Amino acid sequence: MFLSSRMITSVSPSTSTNSSFLLTGFSGMEQQYPWLSIPFSSIYAMVLLGNCMVLHVIWTEPSLHQPMFYFLSMLALTDLCMGLSTVYTVLGILWGIIREISLDSCIAQSYFIHGLSFMESSVLLTMAFDRYIAICNPLRYSSILTNSRIIKIGLTIIGRSFFFITPPIICLKFFNYCHFHILSHSFCLHQDLLRLACSDIRFNSYYALMLVICILLLDAILILFSYILILKSVLAVASQEERHKLFQTCISHICAVLVFYIPIISLTMVHRFGKHLSPVAHVLIGNIYILFPPLMNPIIYSVKTQQIHTRMLRLFSLKRY
């Protein structure tokens, strides 16, 4: 599929800070877009429906108004927002509605994508902390995780996720973009815009690396450390049945952590060492990074968490009758 003359003009090199950017999508597979739109539309529908159902079950069931499920609702809300932040551009390309995005819209989308990624990492860390207290210090669980403290934790997560990424995102607005305005994904990422800029991007590059280390890497280390302490506490329990029961309460969270971090590591490795891979492979990994956690988390918690599983079945049985 060839670009129109108007589109070529809009994505040509310029020093304007108000130009449009071309969203490439699955380059070279434009003829298959109508077919690709079917699975992607289904995935987005499952993301939105699954996370809304988790939120609905927790909201309407008084017995689930506990710290563990409050944190799960934060995770579901984060996943829901992640799906909403990319649905317009991803499906817009596949449906033939859009091919371009303005700089302001691109910056806003990258802000929400990266902010929500940091937020998901923070929520997963908080859920690990919740499991640590529940297993290692159960007698003080309710006194430590009070409702007021949970609200403060939630506000801290939001502030931590979106405040610290503001400086590099604001800088994107004032860069000159003198390379061809062609993005390598179906959505906007900070590193994609940096690649097109001809301004001094050292601050953004170093700052972004610092954020990855201080948030994503630090969270992963703290989650691992919390599970080392949890495992030590579980192994100290004499009864094998009790050990199994305690470990079962952590299975869902462990799966959610793997579902979040494996795509991030894969995307990082592809960007770092996958220069020989086709553009389609890069776009596919990018979409897995965006869509896999929001798709899988409702499934994981609906299957592995007994309270959610029971109420989901009850919800579907009510809808049938």
From Swiss-Prot:
GO molecular function, one term: olfactory receptor activity
UniProt keyword NAD present: no
Sequence intervals crossing the membrane: 35-55, 64-84, 109-129, 149-169, 206-226, 247-267, 283-303
Keyword terms, alphabetized: Cell membrane, Disulfide bond, G-protein coupled receptor, Glycoprotein, Membrane, Olfaction, Receptor, Sensory transduction, Transducer, Transmembrane, Transmembrane helix
Gene Ontology CC: one annotated term: membrane
Residue ranges that the UniProt entry lists as topological domain Extracellular: 1-34, 85-108, 170-205, 268-282
Disulfide bonds: C106-C188
UniProt GO BP: sensory perception of smell
Glycosylation site list: N18
Top-level taxon in the UniProt lineage: Eukaryota
Topology feature Cytoplasmic, residues: 56-63, 130-148, 227-246, 304-321
Subcellular location: Cell membrane
Coiled coil: none
CDD domains registered for this protein in UniProt: 7tmA_OR51-like
Membrane topology: Multi-pass membrane protein
Family: Belongs to the G-protein coupled receptor 1 family.
Function: Odorant receptor.
Name of the protein in its database record: Olfactory receptor 51V1
